[in-house]
Amino acid sequence: MASWVGTELSALNPLRTLWLALAAAFLLALLLQLAPAGLLPNCALFQDLIRYGKTKLSGPRRPAVCRAFDVPKRYFSHFYVVSVLWNGFLLWFLSRSLFLGAPFPNWLRALLRTLGSTQFRALEMESKASQMLVGELALSAFLVLVFLWVHSVRRLFECFYISVFSNAVMHVVQYCFGLVYYVLVGLTVLSQVPMDDKNVYMLGKNLLLPARWFHVLGMMMFLWSSAHQYECHVILSNLRRNKKGAIVHCQHRIPFGDWFEYVSSANYLAELMIYISMAVTFGFHNFTWWLVVAYVFFCQALSAFFNHKFYKSTFVSYPKHRKAFLPFLF
């Protein structure tokens, strides 16, 4: 069993390589924005690819050719439609496999192995300790996939019934990446389920037997972070509504309340905390998922940096104590 764990921790499979590359790319983009003005050339196309929504307004002048690739920001809802359908599809397959022993379809099993799924062998399952460890991993992946699906359902609901979208835009490349993103995240979660040559590890009726304290902590953190993100989106929505809830304008205002008292992009901070809660659910030591968290951190930090810059340049009375993304730090 030790050899399996060591291999699982050390291998740089395609999924880890991809998430590492994405995290490094957004870290580099963030560092370039933090560099002193004039030190690096200001490429309009690069800026157009890393900004969306209101932050495009505070960026460099956009060439006409860039506007040809604009997609309405309200199409964010498409990301969550894809996620609800795709990850619901994966959750159905996983539930049947874990509790009924039904095998994954051949195409899905082959895809997961190509991406770098977690493997175990029957000879490694002889001891009770080994069975418990594999059961913990299987339960962790199941819970995280449930969290991901619930998160997507909530965000889809918010896009339709809470958020008030202006005529802001995003680049078509960002739109295409967003469509693929949740497909990739779902496959990443599913690849963490222990598999042998034919099937995933079956929990059967012993659903709660491998449950551990970090499963409970991860669930509590997920619910807490999700509640804060929902509240932040309600606050942003109310900035464009009257007391009766009717939309009266699509202009930008300074948000107050909840985590907005500390950071400009409280909803982005909540997003990061949601992904950290999933890392906790994996037992803190899932290297693949920490790479996903690293990507989310640098991606959200970059967007938060642009948001903070926009607010400070637009509103003279903007609270000076607020940070961009991390309370009291950044």
UniProtKB/Swiss-Prot annotation:
GO terms for molecular function: 3-oxo-5-alpha-steroid 4-dehydrogenase (NADP+) activity; oxidoreductase activity, acting on the CH-CH group of donors, NAD or NADP as acceptor; polyprenal reductase activity. Keywords: Endoplasmic reticulum, Lipid metabolism, Membrane, NADP, Oxidoreductase, Transmembrane, Transmembrane helix. Its EC number is 1.3.1.94, 1.3.1.22. Its main location: endoplasmic reticulum. It holds the Pfam family Steroid_dh. InterPro entries: 3-oxo-5_a-steroid_4-DH_C, Dfg10/SRD5A3. Pathway: Protein modification; protein glycosylation. Residues 1-19, 96-132, 190-206, 299-330 are cytoplasmic. GO terms for cellular component: endoplasmic reticulum; endoplasmic reticulum membrane. It is an enzyme of class 1 (oxidoreductase). Residues 41-74, 154-168, 228-277 are lumenal. GO terms for biological process: dolichol biosynthetic process; dolichol metabolic process; dolichol-linked oligosaccharide biosynthetic process; polyprenol catabolic process. It is found in: Endoplasmic reticulum membrane. It catalyses: a di-trans,poly-cis-dolichal + NADP(+) = a di-trans,poly-cis-polyprenal + NADPH + H(+); a 3-oxo-5alpha-steroid + NADP(+) = a 3-oxo-Delta(4)-steroid + NADPH + H(+); androst-4-ene-3,17-dione + NADPH + H(+) = 5alpha-androstan-3,17-dione + NADP(+); 17beta-hydroxy-5alpha-androstan-3-one + NADP(+) = testosterone + NADPH + H(+). The chain crosses the membrane at residues 20-40, 75-95, 133-153, 169-189, 207-227, 278-298. It is a multi-pass membrane protein. Plays a key role in early steps of protein N-linked glycosylation by being involved in the conversion of polyprenol into dolichol. Acts as a polyprenal reductase that mediates the reduction of polyprenal into dolichal in a NADP-dependent mechanism. Dolichols are required for the synthesis of dolichol-linked monosaccharides and the oligosaccharide precursor used for N-glycosylation. Also able to convert testosterone (T) into 5-alpha-dihydrotestosterone (DHT). PANTHER family: DFG10 PROTEIN, POLYPRENOL REDUCTASE. Belongs to the steroid 5-alpha reductase family. Polyprenal reductase subfamily. This is Polyprenal reductase. It comes from Mesocricetus auratus. The gene is Srd5a3.
